[in-house]
């Protein structure tokens, strides 16, 4: 009978296969960079970035992320318009809206355009990470990861 060396229960290539893939859509280069660094530090994979709603929708169709972080105020197509398109074409992908204008959008409108959560940018990125974890945990994350 052949002898097998004991190996890790999870091969090295798949140890982090649980990492949820996130698309960041924000017109601010620095904002995208900071959000991306923060999410990756928290254990998520940033699979792509876009600078406006039109580009973001194209990236979402191409990349099929697990979650989308979307800024409200952007050129060409704002976050509410992009969220509406995304919720229609990709309803299984949760959208988290980041904004400095939370009281302008309103919870009812956010729900109507398919946004799962609104995070005020002034609340800090810890709140964003907690929100992303709560939206992804049931489907994509093992209990001991969060």
Task: Give the ranges of each region predicted by the language model.
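Non-catalytic signal-transmission and effector/linker regions of two-component phosphorelay proteins
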Residues: 1-21, 126-146
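Two-component/phosphorelay signaling modules centered on CheY-like receiver
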Residues: 29-48
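Acidic catalytic/metal-coordinating carboxylates
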Residues: 52-55, 78-82
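Receiver (REC) domain active-site loop signature in two-component systems and cognate sites
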Residues: 74
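Alpha4 helix (beta4-alpha4-beta5 surface) of REC/receiver domains from two-component response regulators
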Residues: 81, 102-130, 134
């Amino acid at each position: 009978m052949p002898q097998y060396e004991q190996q890790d229960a999870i091969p090295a290539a798949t140890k982090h296969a649980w990492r949820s893939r996130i698309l960041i859509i924000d017109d601010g280069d620095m904002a995208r960079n900071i959000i991306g660094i923060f999410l990756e530090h928290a254990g998520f994979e940033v699979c792509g970035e876009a600078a406006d709603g039109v580009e973001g929708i194209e990236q979402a169709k191409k990349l099929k992320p697990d979650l989308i972080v979307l800024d409200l105020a952007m050129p060409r197509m704002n976050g509410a318009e992009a969220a509406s398109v995304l919720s229609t074409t990709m309803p299984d992908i949760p959208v988290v809206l980041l904004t400095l204008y939370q009281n302008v959008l309103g919870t009812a409108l956010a729900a109507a355009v398919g946004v799962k959560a609104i995070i005020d940018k002034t609340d800090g990125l810890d709140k964003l990470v907690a929100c992303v974890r709560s939206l992804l945990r049931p489907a994509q994350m093992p209990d001991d990861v969060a």
